[in-house]
Structures are given as structure tokens and as C-alpha cells.
A protein has these predicted regions:
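Structural detector for helix-capping/boundary residues
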Residues: 37, 51, 107-110, 119
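N-terminal strand-loop-strand
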Residues: 1-34
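Charged phosphate-binding loop/patch that engages nucleotide di/tri-phosphates or the phosphate backbone
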Residues: 114-140
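Short, charged, solvent-exposed linker or helix-capping segments at domain edges/interfaces
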Residues: 94-100, 115-118
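Short, charged/polar surface micro-motifs in flexible loops or helix N-caps
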Residues: 20-21, 28-31, 40-41, 88-93
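Active-site-adjacent beta-strand/loop module that shapes the phosphate/pyrophosphate-binding cleft
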Residues: 70-95, 105-107, 120, 127, ...
Length: 140
């Protein structure tokens, strides 16, 4: 496996509100994705995740301190390493920077798994859902 510095680094937000996940259409409008983008020089992964959630989906909120995982993908000959953070959404704007070419959809966890094509991302989310369920059972 290639070293992480041989990948283009990206960060993503997994936006959650009222038990639902926010998805947006990809830049070409053909797939449903979570907000993500390139980590710019001088920016942390968390800052990037929050910025992309705002630009792509019009969402404001707070990230969990630690990422829930990461996944790899290839596109147009480049390899990407995406760090994923859970985002607790506190505000949803009716207008946002990329509104003119992205759709936003709130889906149940089941709907998320039906729409997301990146298998590694789906696995990260599946494990997170299971972990949260176990924590709630332990508290009961």
C-alpha cells in the first residue's frame, strides 16, 4: 500500500441531525455523497470538513473531536485519502455557496446505505452506527 503522503488529502463531514444524515449530489450531479474537499495548506482536516459542509450543503455545526475513520478512492488517475468527521448540525441555511448546482437530501441511516456508492465510507458509517447502538444499550 502506498504511503499516506502519496495521496491527495481530503476531509469530509458526516452531517447528522434528528437521526438523519445529510447527503449532497456530487459536483457532476450523478451520485450522492457527503460534503468533502481538499485540505488546503495551513488548514486542518476539521476546518476543511466544516468549510465543505457549509459550501456544499449550507450546514453549520460542530464536529466530534476525533475522526470516525478514513477511506481511499481513485478518480481521474489520482488517489485520495479522506478523513471523515461526524458533524452535529445546528443550523441549515436556505441559501449556500453551491446551492445552484447541488441538491441536499436528509436520509435515514437505511437511506444512506442505499445511496452511497463508496463501500469503505459505508463501512465506516456502519461501524459508527453499531458503536452508538452498543453505547446506548450499555447505558440502559
Amino acid at each position: 500500500m502506498a504511503q499516506p503522503d502519496m495521496y491527495v488529502r481530503q476531509a469530509a463531514a458526516l452531517p447528522l441531525r434528528n437521526g438523519r444524515v445529510c447527503l449532497v449530489t456530487s459536483s457532476n450531479g450523478k451520485r450522492w455523497v457527503i460534503p468533502k474537499g481538499l485540505i488546503e495548506p495551513g488548514q486542518t482536516a476539521g476546518e476543511t470538513a466544516l468549510q465543505e459542509a457549509w459550501e456544499e450543503a449550507g450546514l453549520l455545526g460542530a464536529l466530534d473531536r476525533e475522526p470516525i475513520g478514513s477511506y481511499l478512492y481513485e478518480k481521474e488517475g489520482l488517489r485520495y485519502h479522506v478523513t471523515v468527521f461526524v458533524m452535529k448540525v445546528t443550523a441549515v441555511a436556505q441559501d449556500w455557496p453551491e446551492r445552484s448546482f447541488r441538491q441536499r437530501s436528509w436520509v435515514s441511516p437505511t437511506g444512506f446505505f442505499e445511496r452511497i456508492e463508496e463501500g469503505d465510507l459505508a463501512e465506516i458509517v456502519r461501524l459508527t452506527v453499531l458503536q452508538h447502538a452498543e453505547e446506548h444499550l450499555a447505558e440502559a
